[in-house]
A protein has these predicted regions:
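Cytoplasmic helix-loop-helix junction between adjacent transmembrane helices
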Residues: 106-144
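Helix-to-loop junctions at the C-terminal end of transmembrane segments
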Residues: 63-75, 271-282
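Helix-loop-helix hairpin linking two adjacent transmembrane segments in secondary transporters
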Residues: 140-189
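Paired small-residue
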Residues: 90, 101-109, 310-318
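Juxtamembrane intracellular "pre-TM" segments in multi-pass secondary transporters
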Residues: 2-6, 191-223, 428-430
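Cytoplasmic membrane-interface "Motif A"-like loop-to-helix N-cap segments
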Residues: 73-83, 279-292
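Extracytoplasmic gate region of multi-pass secondary transporters
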Residues: 31-33, 217-271, 357-365
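Extracytoplasmic
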Residues: 12-46, 62, 236-242, 360-365
Length: 431
């Protein structure tokens, strides 16, 4: 019995950060389900709504490197507890305030709290599981975590319609608090932590290592390409997709959220599929292909006038698959730096990636206000027609195409540099 208990103990410990990782997807998608209510609550336009959505990503991105350092210095139990409680309190603040600036602060804090989601899972896996199981457990974690994105769509929308958004928001806030306290009282580190991915000797964070990343033009171009291509997920999928579908096809919120959920279904399969493609065709070719495919999907989507749920589900499923290009970006980045700089490189790329969400939400909101036709509802809140949505969302395929061009050029340049190095090594060996 004791052996059996110890056999399943790592999975029990893994459960707590995993629950928070899945939960934070629901808070991330919350504005997409509440656009009209939020605009009415704070008497704001699309530009301010985009800013409100963007502040989540500001908080999330700026904490990537600090959270990684905190998890190494303190236990995962303490850090996940603090950040989960912060998420819950910030969600309560957002629910009950009518002050727009407090709402901005609360969304920023929710982003800060959510930043420990994946990093906390990674830390616990590295402590409790053998090194050979790390990749498999990370894959399982992403699969379970994306369920938060799936259930954060239509199911949550249906609950909102039944019980009201404020009641649902309060329940979600208390769930975060419960996860935090459960983690604090139940999660532990192994008494004898065996060497694993995070336990192998490594250098502590040094400014010189970070400077090496910031002075690499290839890393910057890779990061900028990633930012430009992230609009399909963090711009459209996270926030603007649901209101767009409701306006374009006159469907209810639940059906629109259900269609958007196919993006997250696609992401369940995208990681392994694109990894196989990258081995055959190369990282940069696959990333470029994903960007051009995104552009094509959005051209088809924005030109479509007839509501066809099967067609839309298929497009969003494919979109979800190619949104996993971000995994290949990390792989490409790892090949550009020395092993000692790998961790800080991944954190930097992920930071810029999440800033892409802030960029797209802000720009989309601004463009919507530019093309606002002047309609207001009974509360005096702006109503945006389909043309405002189409003009604003056109930024997504334009940026995806631009990012693809940059990434293809970077791929050619990296390959040329690699060939030159090999040629020099060959000449030296021959000499």
């Amino acid at each position: 019995m004791l052996t059996l208990r110890h056999k399943y103990l790592p999975f029990f410990m893994w459960l707590f950060p995993l629950l928070f990782f899945a939960y934070q997807f629901i808070l991330r998608l919350w504005p997409s389900l509440m656009m009209n209510q939020i605009m009415d609550q704070f008497s704001i336009n699309a530009s301010h709504f985009g800013m409100l959505a963007a502040f989540y990503y500001y908080g999330y991105s700026v904490m990537q490197i600090p959270v990684a350092i905190l998890l190494d210095r303190f236990s995962a139990r303490r850090i996940i507890f603090v950040f989960a409680v912060l998420c819950g309190l910030a969600a309560l603040m957002f629910t009950y305030t009518s002050n727009f600036y407090l709402a901005l602060l609360s969304r920023f804090l929710i982003g800060v709290g959510s930043s420990v989601g994946f990093l906390g899972v990674s830390k616990v896996i590295s402590e409790w599981f053998p090194k050979v199981q790390y990749a498999r457990m990370i894959g399982f974690s992403f699969t379970f975590g994306l369920m938060g994105g799936i259930y954060g769509g239509r199911p949550v929308s249906m609950v909102i319609e039944t019980y009201g958004w404020q009641m649902v928001a309060v329940v979600l806030a208390y769930i975060s608090l419960m996860i935090g306290f459960a983690t604090y009282f139940a999660l532990r580190s192994p008494q004898n932590i065996k060497k694993s991915i995070s336990d192998v000797p490594h250098e502590s964070f040094k400014i010189a290592n970070f400077k090496a990343i910031l002075t690499s033009p290839f890393i910057w171009l890779l990061a900028c390409s990633n930012l430009l291509m992230v609009g399909s997920l963090e711009g459209f999928g996270d926030v603007w997709g649901v209101p767009y579908l409701m306006t374009a096809y006159a469907i209810n919120k639940g059906d629109a959220a259900g269609l958007i959920s196919f993006i997250f279904f696609g992401m369940l399969f995208g990681g392994p599929l694109l990894a196989l493609c990258s081995k055959r065709f190369g990282n940069y070719s696959v990333i470029g292909m994903c960007g051009f495919t995104m552009m094509l999907i959005f051209v088809l989507l924005l030109q479509s006038k007839t509501y066809n749920p099967i067609k839309l589900s298929f497009l969003f499923f494919v979109l979800g698959i190619i949104c996993c290009y971000q995994v290949i970006v990390f792989s490409a980045g790892s090949s550009l730096v020395e092993p000692k700089n790998l961790g800080i490189t991944i954190a930097f790329l992920n930071c810029i990636n999440m800033l892409g969400g802030s960029f797209f939400h802000t720009v989309i909101g601004k463009i919507m206000d530019i093309f606002w036709a002047g309609a207001l509802n009974d509360s005096g809140v702006r109503i945006y027609d389909i043309y405002a949505y189409k003009y604003s969302l056109s930024i997504v395929p334009v940026c995806a195409g631009l990012g693809s061009i940059i990434i293809v050029l970077v791929g050619f340049r990296v390959q040329n540099s690699y060939n030159q190095v090999k040629s020099k090594e060959f000449l030296i060996s021959e000499g």
